[in-house]
Amino acid sequence: MAKYNFDEVIDRHGTDCLKYDFGMKRKGRDDLLPLWVADMDFRLPDEILDEFHKRIDHGIFGYTDPLDEYFAAMNHWFSTRYGYTIEPDWVTLGAGIVYALGTSVRAFTEEGDAMMVMQPVYYPFSEVIKNDGRRLVNCQLRYENNHYSIDFEKMERMILEEGVKALIFCNPHNPVG
């Protein structure tokens, strides 16, 4: 892969970019500095763009199935880090984390059920719970000595007191590690 220029500044204003073009619409201000996690401001490497162009030049955009290489890459990642492998039939692909989370919330809980998150956490987790008619229970992460951790005694107490039916556990925890 070629050397990548991380110093290149790309102005994304005027490209229908949620991160930059919708601050006024969503927050009523256009002077905010968006510090997003999953929306990078780096240009894709040419090697990746070339593969996109091959697919585009084919001209057909029907339904696809994940390639064997997808599962091989996933298993390499899991085996390298955790020493185990994933069977392809264990995996259900989704259109994104928020959509997949909403589908899971509706599949495994009922309206009115209590669901727990540990804030600070990726804000759509709480929105999905509330928007799907579930009751949000926040077990605030403990912050001590510049480090976040779970207070397991508090968490257990809240689960029992609030009748929590499901916990959304973000690992690694976004945004605090």
Language-model segments: which ranges?
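Conserved core of the PLP fold type I
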Residues: F61-G177
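N-terminal small-domain helix-loop-helix segment of the aminotransferase-like
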Residues: A2-G96, T103
